[in-house]
Regions:
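Bacterial extracytoplasmic/cell-wall-associated proteins, especially those involved in peptidoglycan
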Residues: 2-224
Length: 224
């Protein structure tokens, strides 16, 4: 459909200009509570989501994007990972870790997020396995360019598009994170079943944090 009335729409490439992107609308269906008439059209449903998204992205945010030489799709893609990986209290910290990995001089230029990866064993919240694979009728049927563009363990930088529809807190954190000291220079994070986040700058520190998280998880599972 034609949604050119919304400012953000002009910043989102058409399918022909983004051949590796899975879905154009992904990321822009703003999460909110809505009321619809049951006989309304799909176009009007989508337009309502888009209008709400459009209202969130202010002129100041567009100016900040320009200042950072960042596109709106890049921001929303980053924010979608923040949305999936962090609770609100950790949005800025997780966003900073991802931005550290995306920096030009990063020693770890891949997001390596299990929320969009080839790793089937971690498929509870995995975009490639839960959404893309069913659409194509199974993993083996996914076009190779799509897998390459969304598997964050193989593609450098951001994937070809968002993996969810982030809320405004995740979007703001992705645009201008305010991390704590622990996360400021970190390249890694891991969580435990109690919801604690552990941040690390080096792989050895991260491996130690993984062991700490595993011990917590073992205790939690024992208490069940």
């Amino acid at each position: 459909g034609d949604f050119s009335e919304y400012t953000f729409w002009q910043h989102v490439p058409d399918d022909a200009d983004a051949p590796d992107r899975f879905m154009k609308c992904e990321g822009y269906l703003f999460p909110e509570t809505y009321e619809f008439l049951k006989d309304d059209t799909v176009h009007n449903y989508v337009a309502t989501f888009y209008a709400q998204f459009d209202a969130q992205i202010t002129d100041a945010m567009y100016a900040e994007l320009k200042k950072q030489d960042m596109t709106l799709p890049q921001l929303i893609t980053l924010a979608s990972f923040v949305q999936e990986e962090a609770g609100n209290s950790q949005d800025s910290n997780v966003a900073q870790v991802f931005r550290n990995r995306l920096a030009a001089d990063s020693p770890y230029p891949r997001l390596q997020s299990n929320t969009s990866s080839y790793i089937q064993s971690d498929s509870d919240n995995n975009y490639l396995w839960n959404w893309v694979a069913p659409y194509y009728g199974g993993w083996d049927n996914i076009p190779g360019n799509i897998v390459a563009a969304y598997d964050t363990y193989s593609c450098k930088g951001l994937p070809a598009g968002p993996i969810s529809n982030p809320g405004i807190a995740a979007i703001k954190a992705a645009l201008a994170p305010q991390p704590n000291e622990e996360a400021k220079d970190a390249y890694f994070f891991v969580t435990d079943l109690k919801g604690s986040y552990y941040y690390a700058r080096t792989l050895s520190e991260h491996n130690a944090n993984c062991q700490k998280a595993a011990q917590v998880n073992k205790t939690v599972n024992t208490e069940k």
